[in-house]
């Protein structure tokens, strides 16, 4: 979350940051340069991809890999419109175990994503319910910023905004937050004590 400070974002507010190899999200409230509140949400891009793989296997009886799931997630998902598209992909037949081609639709991808997106929304709502009134008022005005690769899912900001009842905005620097966070740790006095050099193993 420390890496989300950029010119396009306020110096304080709630941020939903995907990290840890896309396995988790870190939902935090920050006042530069400090992170005041942080909560781990065990949902990230990896879980979204696995959900697409699992639902496709159950409904279409053929298996696809996580890389294919990631591609169709970006190509077919849309949480704001009733998108009607499909892609032909290669996978493995669930009965014979042989390579095959199959069709994955946008409706299947959206269905697979919604449970994870809803879980993120519910966790954020629970956190907002426990925030002091002055912070809650600030969030209602400034909104929440989302970063990480899942920000590329079309209309995820609008979907979460309807669920949360506050503005949700996408960071323009979703793919650089880890690097920028390391920069914050190194260059800011309040965070510098958390930085250390990793010793090489002998």
Predicted regions and their residues:
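Conserved phosphate-binding catalytic cores of ATP/NTP-utilizing and phosphoryl-transfer enzymes
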Residues: 1-17, 183-187, 191
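Conserved phosphate-binding/catalytic loops in two-lobed NTP-binding clefts
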Residues: 158-183, 192
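Phosphate-binding glycine-rich/basic clefts of nucleotide- and phosphate-handling proteins
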Residues: 31-118, 129
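Phosphate/ATP-binding catalytic cores across multiple sugar-kinase/actin-like superfamilies
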Residues: 112-140, 185-189
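Short, charged, intrinsically disordered terminal tails
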Residues: 187-202
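Gly/Thr-rich phosphate-binding beta-strand-loop-beta motif of the actin/hexokinase/Hsp70
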Residues: 8-35, 83-84, 154
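Glycine-rich phosphate-binding loops at beta-strand->alpha-helix junctions
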Residues: 77, 81, 136-160
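Residue-level signature of catalytic and energy-coupling elements of molecular machines
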Residues: 18, 52, 124, 146, ...
